[in-house]
């Protein structure tokens, strides 16, 4: 049968390739093997094709015939295993980067096939922007249905993780602590729950149930139309950011509308606090009932008497479902959820370390890994486990139990302490950790897909903010951070497309980063908003009066204090580098023309040097003792002056004698023959 298939394949090749004598030698075993493998896969790579092509000169007709023959056989010729992704990326980037894809094959040797398709990809790998764009282009855009599907996966993963956390007693212990902290005023409500999601959650979730599809579609179109208008307005005001290097702002009217429509965080807290406290009280009461059943379950495992009765199991499930429903209604802050997950993972890590120590000890005595796991699984808290393994007939069990008796007991005691800390059995704890990990993994994968599919949106927005103090890749990075926040907060039930929602977050992240990082001297965001407002008003008045407005006119127009306007205009100026070239030849810098207030002027330096020299000559005309006394008393040529007592100690005489020597020396200096030389310095 295999021989017949091979003969059919060769017949196909001979029938399709015979007319012009194609490049492939069909009698060659390597060619036959390559074609057979290519038919199974549906493609052949350039490297594989080049390895079987002849090395002599060939015509373009032969190359075209070979490519056509392979195509007719259902075999695609690709560059490499990842060529399809690269091709998709090249299609997206080709217009921007001026690349020519799929050009005509030139007459050459067999390697010419690869040369025509491998031109650009290897040349542009050094440019990180092009590499990023190429990889980004390999991801397909999402449709509206695709966005909803991924959003549902994110929601399902998060709910799985929350459900796992709700089965852990540690979660409810933390919730009770947070409730007490709220009552005592030690923490804010916004630190425990997501205020915006909790405040708008019920209305948002109810929308699909109580609104018709036509109404939802109409609202969505109205929102998109409003977004287009807002983008147009923002584009008209984009130049404001260029002038001040700050954050782009929408028109003032829109800002005022947003302020009116959004409640403050304090108002949200005041409105939600009673409801949240009531929910936390319900959780605390329900958990007390559940805790009793969990304690009974752990005691049953420790006593090796089995599990709960069927009635207790049903009651346990009912209480657990009530708690899960109550916790979901809270919309916990993501930071709090992360803290709960981290707590679970930390205990799981300690449990794994102890069990790993126990396994390694057993293996050191020749116990098989599979045998150990078979005996250990399900008996983590069994008090009779030591007795049972010491009676096993398998290799190493008796030696292991006898030699490491105390170590085994210590490790199992630590494991039992972990079970007591978690409030549930080890098997149940492992199941909860696995459930949380599964939900977190599913949500993370779905979020990654949503982010990667919308990277083009970040590029399109970041292009508008170039040349404003940050490099293009930095803008993309900040925009991607905003995109990830948008994915975390996206609510598909509202009926809007993700791009409509994400645009605000991306623009906000980019403009905030420009405000924080673009300027050498950082200006607060609220001050940048004031600068933008003044710049817009100044441009408007320029069109009205035909000249730049004065600070007084701006203050009157904006109803702002004159001093504040002047202060803002002064702040808006960009710092200039002292290394800025000056002149056409650029051989001097701006710093060369700035006066140094601390530097000594040349004339003053000359006068000081002349005074020092003249004083030295005049003092040299006195006796050595008189000269030294004057120098020490007045600090001439020394670090500091000296008192009469200090000078007297140097010469081993009294203070009075030093005073007399000083007075005599000063009288000598007042003589016209000496004073005449120093008098000229008084005028200077």
From Swiss-Prot:
Keyword Acetylation recorded: no
Origin organism lineage: Bacteria, Pseudomonadati, Pseudomonadota, Alphaproteobacteria, Hyphomicrobiales
Gene Ontology annotations of biological process type: DNA-templated transcription initiation
Cellular component terms (Gene Ontology): cytoplasm
Family annotation (Pfam families): Sigma70_ner, Sigma70_r1_1, Sigma70_r1_2, Sigma70_r2, Sigma70_r3, Sigma70_r4
Region (Sigma-70 factor domain-3): 529-605
Gene: rpoD
Official protein name in the record: RNA polymerase sigma factor RpoD
Compositional bias ranges of the Acidic residues kind: 83-102, 250-261
Alphabetized CDD domains for the sequence: Sigma70_r4
Location relative to the cell: Cytoplasm
Native source species: Rhizobium meliloti (strain 1021)
């Amino acid at each position: 049968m295999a021989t017949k298939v091979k003969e059919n394949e060769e017949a196909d090749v001979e029938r399709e390739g015979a007319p012009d004598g194609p490049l492939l030698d069909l009698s060659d075993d390597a060619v036959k093997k390559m074609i057979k493998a290519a038919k199974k896969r549906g493609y052949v790579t350039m490297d594989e094709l080049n390895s079987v092509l002849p090395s002599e000169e060939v015509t373009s007709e032969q190359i075209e015939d070979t490519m056509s023959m392979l195509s007719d056989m259902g075999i695609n010729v690709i560059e490499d295993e990842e060529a399809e992704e690269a091709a998709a990326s090249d299609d997206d980037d080709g217009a921007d980067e001026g690349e020519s894809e799929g050009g005509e094959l030139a007459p050459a040797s067999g390697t010419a096939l690869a040369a025509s398709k491998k031109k650009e990809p290897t040349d542009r790998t050094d440019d990180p922007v092009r590499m990023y764009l190429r990889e980004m282009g390999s991801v397909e855009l999402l449709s509206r249905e695709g966005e909803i599907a991924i959003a549902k996966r994110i929601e399902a993963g998060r709910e799985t993780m929350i459900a796992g956390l709700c089965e852990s007693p540690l979660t409810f212990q933390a919730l009770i602590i947070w409730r007490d902290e709220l009552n005592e005023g030690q923490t804010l409500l916004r630190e425990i729950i997501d205020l915006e999601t909790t405040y708008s959650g019920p209305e948002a979730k109810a929308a699909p149930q109580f609104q018709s599809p036509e109404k939802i579609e109409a609202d969505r179109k109205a929102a998109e139309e409003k977004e287009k208008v807002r983008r147009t307005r923002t584009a008209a005001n984009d130049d404001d950011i260029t002038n001040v290097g700050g954050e782009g702002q929408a028109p003032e009217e829109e800002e005022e509308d947003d302020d009116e429509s959004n409640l403050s965080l304090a108002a949200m807290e005041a409105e939600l606090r009673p409801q949240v406290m009531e929910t936390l009280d319900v959780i605390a009461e329900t958990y007390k009932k559940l805790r009793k059943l969990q304690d009974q379950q752990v005691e049953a495992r420790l006593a090796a008497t089995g599990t709960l009765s069927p009635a207790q199991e049903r009651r346990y499930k009912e209480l657990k479902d009530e708690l899960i429903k109550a916790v979901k209604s809270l919309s916990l802050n993501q930071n709090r959820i992360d803290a709960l997950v981290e707590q679970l993972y930390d205990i799981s890590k300690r449990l794994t370390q102890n069990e790993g120590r126990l396994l390694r000890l057993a293996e050191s005595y020749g116990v098989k890994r599979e045998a150990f796991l078979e005996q250990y699984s399900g008996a983590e808290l069994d008090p009779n486990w030591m007795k049972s393994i010491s009676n096993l007939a398998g290799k190493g069990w008796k030696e292991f139990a006898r030699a490491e008796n105390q170590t085994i007991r210590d490790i199992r005691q630590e494991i039992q302490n972990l079970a007591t800390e978690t409030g549930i059995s080890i098997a149940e704890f492992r199941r909860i950790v696995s459930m949380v990990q599964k939900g977190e993994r599913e949500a993370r994968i779905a979020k990654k897909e949503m982010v990667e599919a919308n990277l083009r949106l970040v590029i399109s927005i970041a292009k508008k903010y170039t040349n404003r103090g940050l490099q293009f890749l930095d803008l993309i990075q900040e925009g991607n951070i905003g995109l990830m926040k948008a994915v975390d907060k996206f609510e598909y039930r509202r009926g809007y497309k993700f791009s409509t929602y994400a645009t605000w977050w991306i623009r906000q992240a980019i403009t905030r980063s420009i405000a924080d990082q673009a300027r050498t001297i950082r200006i607060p965001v609220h001050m940048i908003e004031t600068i933008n407002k003044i710049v817009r008003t100044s441009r408007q008045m320029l069109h009205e009066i035909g000249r730049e407005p004065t600070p007084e006119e701006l203050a009157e127009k904006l109803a702002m204090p004159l001093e504040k306007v002047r202060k803002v205009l002064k702040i808006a100026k960009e710092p200039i580098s002292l290394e800025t070239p000056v002149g056409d030849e650029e051989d001097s810098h701006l710093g060369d023309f700035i006066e140094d207030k601390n530097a000594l002027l040349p004339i003053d330096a000359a006068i000081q040097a002349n005074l020092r020299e003249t004083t030295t000559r005049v003092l040299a005309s006195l006796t050595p003792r008189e000269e030294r006394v004057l120098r020490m008393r007045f600090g001439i040529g020394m670090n500091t002056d000296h008192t009469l007592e200090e000078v007297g100690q140097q010469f081993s005489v009294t203070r009075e004698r030093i005073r007399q020597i000083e007075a005599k020396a000063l009288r000598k200096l007042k003589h016209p023959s000496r004073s005449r030389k120093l008098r000229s310095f008084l005028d200077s």
